[in-house]
Each structure stands twice: as structure tokens, then as C-alpha cells.
Curated annotation (Swiss-Prot):
The modification Phosphohistidine is found at residue 259. Residues 360-450 form the Histidine kinase domain. InterPro entries: HATPase_C_sf (IPR036890), sCache_2 (IPR033480), Sensor_HK_TwoCompSys (IPR050482), Sig_transdc_His_kin_sub3_dim/P (IPR011712), Sig_transdc_His_kinase_MctS (IPR017171). It comes from Rhizobium johnstonii (strain DSM 114642 / LMG 32736 / 3841). Member of the two-component regulatory system MctS/MctR, which activates mctP expression. This is Sensor histidine kinase MctS.
């Protein structure tokens, strides 16, 4: 991590940590306070319900007390009279009294008449609670509350119910009534939803205050970093271009020396040996054959030197322009490799600076080298054209293609691609590579800024 990154981290990290800590504490405190309030509210509601059903049970017992006290244990008439009274005690759609005997047989149930006369001792609710058995046990133990799930008459849905039961021990009866708790839970859920909304609102307010602060600090640091990086990139590109210019100058110098010095000398040697061969041929056949071979070798050396000279700096690029240089490059490439090579430059108008022409030529040259070494192609096509004053060039082959990340940016091929990209980047141009199993297409795009000034274009014309 660089010093600047460390400074940015020291500026942002403590701020982010403090914001997260404050937000977490506020959220936790709000959640605890709301939870405690909701729990208290729910407990108060349950206590109110408990008091309500206790009072209702006492009223029912008062209504049957006289009959029950006077009746015997087997007084069927009294039992029927008490059952009728309890059936008639109705308070709302979901308010009623029920009666079971100790064996689990239903005696009174105004809302579910199908239960009358049947044994429900083994009845269980969705939670697995043996409802009737538990109610009987609670009543035998002296009476009390029991919570379970039961069908709510007004909706037909299963809901939580809280019942209070007492026993009429002389008759072995269990008398009870209850209230449904879904309204309590609904109010608790609404309060809980309100609590979550308040916490979310608090979190949003904190975020609206703190996030911009972090963004301002981060943006300021990043702007400074990007500014310095842009300056460093500019300096690096300038240095890279100076290196490229130096290389071009050295190549041009070497090309001149090879062409004007060594090549001319070798041509002289060839003519001298040719003359010697003609003089010797009349007398000594072996000497003539040896000289002919020497001439052939010298011809090969001359051809190789000229090829090297062309690779280093083709004079045709300076003398005849980019189109002619690319045509010569295609011709020599096809002759050397046997790959069918075509060029189409019919739509190109040469308005580029000399340096831009060199850059496009070197891009094509490097692309040809990659095709020869790696692609295994049988066809190669070059297209050069102008689009609204912007030079464009594509180099396409039908080779194997490559993965631009794994293959194209590794080894010598990767260095070549980087060199091509740097050459284009110097002129603010683009280098696009589209590679697949069907082949590779390389597109070089020069901006208008790479063109010669208008007055120089007129002079060139």
C-alpha cells in the first residue's frame, strides 16, 4: 500500500467505523426500547383478556349456582336446566360457554353442535396440544387458564384462544369460556411493524447525513489520486513515445547504413566475382562453378540485408506513404510465409502525420508477426480506410484465435499487443481486438488529432 493510500485509509476508515458504531448503537437501543414497549403492551392486553373471561365465568357460575346447589349428583333435570342456561349465555359472535364431562364427552357447545354427545378426549390442536384433556386436568386442579388453538366461529380460521375453566365436581363437569387472541397478536404485529419502520427511518436519516460525508472525503481523496495518476500517465506516455521515437531514429539510421554501405559493397563483390567467373570459365570449369556459388550466396546475403533494411524502416513509407508501405509489407509477407494476403486501401485518404503513419505501419507489422508465429492462419486481409477524416485499419485472419486475457497478454505476443496499444494510445487512438475460434480481427482507430495540419496537407498534395 502506497503512502497516499495509507493517508486515504487513515482519513476514511475511522470515520466509517464511528458511523457504523453510532448507527448500530442507535438501532440496537431503538429496537430494545420498542421490543420492551411491545412486550409490555401485549402483557397488559393479555391481563385484560384474563380478567374479562374470569368475570364472565363468575357470572355464569352465579347464574347456575342455585340450581347446582339444590341438585343431586344424578339429577338429570337439573343438568339439562344448567346446560340450557349455559347454552343461552351468548356474548358476541365468538363468545360462548362450553361444558365437558371428566371423560371428555361434550355436553354444551353452542357454536359447534356436532360435538354434542361425542368424546373429544384425544382431540389435538395444530401444535399437538391435547386440548380437552388439558382443560379437564386444569379444572380438576382447581381451575385456571389454558391457551391453545381453536377454530374461530366468525372467520372459520384456526386462531389462538385463551380459556378459563372450572369444575362442577358433583357432576364431574368442566365449565369454561374463552377469548380469541388474534386481535392481540395483530395489534402487537402492527406495533412491531411500526417499530421497524421507525428504526428504518432513523437508519435512513443517519445514512443521509453520514454517507455524503464519507463520499465527500473519499471523492476528494480519489480526485487528488486520479489527478496525480493522470499526470504520471502523461509523463509515462511521453517517455514511452520518446523511447519509440529513439527506436525509429536508430532503425532509420541502420537502414540507411545497410542500404548505402553494406548493400553497395556486396553488389560490387557480386559483379567482381561474376567477371572473374567469365574469365576463368574458359579454362577451369570447377573454378567457375565455385564462383557461381559464391555469387549465389552473395545474392542471398544482399536479399537478406534488404529484407532487414525493410523491416527496420521501409523507405517506401517515407517516399510513397502508408498505403504503398502496407502493400509492400503484404507482398513480402505472402512471399515469405505462403499465407494468402490481401489489402484494400481504396477508401483511404492519407492525411496522417508521419508519426501516425509509422504507428499504423508498426501495428500492422506486429500483427503480421503474431499471425505468422501463433495463429496458424491460411488467409490474411488488411483494410485501410478513412471515416470522416479519421484513419481506420483492420487486420483479419482465419487462424485459431486466442484468449485476450490468458494468451494475448502473456509472453512475446503480449508484449507485442502492449506495444501496439501504447502506439495507439500516444495518439489517443483505440486498438480493439476481437478473437474467436474462427479467427482474429484487430482494429486500429486514429482520431482526427493524428492528422497533419490543413496547410501541410495542402503542401503534401
Amino acid at each position: 500500500m502506497t503512502l497516499r493510500h495509507q493517508i486515504i485509509a487513515l482519513a476514511i476508515v475511522p470515520l466509517v467505523i464511528s458511523i457504523l458504531a453510532i448507527t448500530t448503537f442507535i438501532t440496537w437501543q431503538s429496537a430494545n426500547l420498542a421490543k420492551n414497549s411491545i412486550d409490555t403492551f401485549e402483557q397488559n392486553m393479555l391481563k385484560t383478556k384474563e380478567a374479562e373471561i374470569l368475570n364472565l365465568t363468575n357470572l355464569a357460575l352465579s347464574a347456575i349456582q342455585t340450581i347446582y346447589d339444590k341438585a343431586g349428583s344424578d339429577d338429570e333435570a337439573a343438568k339439562q336446566q344448567v346446560a340450557a342456561i349455559l347454552t343461552s349465555l351468548d356474548y358476541g359472535k365468538d363468545g360462548y360457554f362450553f361444558v365437558y364431562d371428566y371423560d371428555g364427552n361434550n355436553i354444551v357447545h353452542p357454536r359447534q353442535s356436532f360435538r354434542h354427545g361425542h368424546n373429544w378426549l384425544d382431540l389435538t390442536d395444530p401444535d399437538g396440544d391435547k386440548v380437552i384433556a388439558e382443560l379437564i386436568a386444569t379444572a380438576k386442579a382447581g381451575g385456571g387458564l389454558h391457551q391453545y388453538k381453536w377454530q374461530k366461529p366468525s372467520t372459520g380460521q384456526i386462531a389462538d384462544k385463551l380459556s378459563f375453566v372450572v369444575s362442577l365436581d358433583k357432576w364431574h363437569w368442566v365449565v369454561g369460556t374463552g377469548v380469541y387472541l388474534d386481535d392481540v397478536f395483530a395489534q402487537s404485529a402492527a406495533a412491531n411493524a411500526g417499530m421497524r419502520a421507525n428504526i428504518k427511518r432513523t437508519f435512513v436519516i443517519v445514512a443521509l447525513i453520514d454517507v455524503p460525508s464519507v463520499l465527500v472525503v473519499f471523492t476528494t481523496c480519489m480526485l487528488l489520486t486520479f489527478h496525480e495518476r493522470r499526470m504520471a500517465d502523461s509523463r509515462l506516455k511521453a517517455l514511452t513515445q520518446r523511447v519509440i521515437d529513439t527506436q525509429e531514429e536508430e532503425r532509420a539510421r541502420l537502414a540507411r547504413e545497410l542500404h548505402d554501405g553494406i548493400s553497395q559493397n556486396l553488389v560490387g563483390v557480386r559483379y567482381a566475382m561474376d567477371l572473374a567467373g567469365r574469365k576463368v570459365r574458359t579454362n577451369v570449369d570447377d573454378a567457375a562453378l565455385t564462383i557461381d556459388r559464391g555469387v549465389e550466396a552473395l545474392n542471398g546475403a544482399i536479399k537478406e540485408i534488404r529484407r532487414l533494411s525493410h523491416d527496420l524502416r521501409p523507405r517506401v513509407l517515407d517516399d510513397l506513404g502508408l498505403t504503398a508501405a502496407l502493400e509492400a509489407l503484404c507482398y513480402h509477407f505472402a512471399e515469405r510465409t505462403g499465407i494468402e494476403t490481401k489489402i484494400d486501401a481504396s477508401g483511404f485518404t492519407d492525411t496522417l502525420k508521419a508519426e501516425a503513419n509509422t504507428a499504423l505501419y508498426r501495428v500492422a507489422q506486429e500483427a503480421f508477426n503474431n499471425v505468422e508465429r501463433h495463429a496458424g492462419a491460411s488467409k490474411l486481409a488488411v483494410k485501410l480506410w478513412s471515416d470522416n477524416g479519421r484513419a481506420r485499419m483492420t487486420v483479419s485472419d482465419n487462424g485459431a484465435g486466442f484468449d485476450g486475457i490468458k494468451d494475448g497478454m502473456s509472453g512475446r505476443s503480449g508484449l507485442g499487443l502492449r506495444n501496439m496499444q501504447e502506439r495507439m494510445a500516444h495518439f489517443r487512438g483505440l486498438l480493439l481486438i476481437n478473437s474467436s475460434e474462427a479467427g482474429t480481427t484487430l482494429t486500429a482507430m486514429m482520431p482526427k488529432s493524428a492528422n497533419r495540419p490543413v496547410n501541410r496537407q495542402a503542401e503534401a498534395a
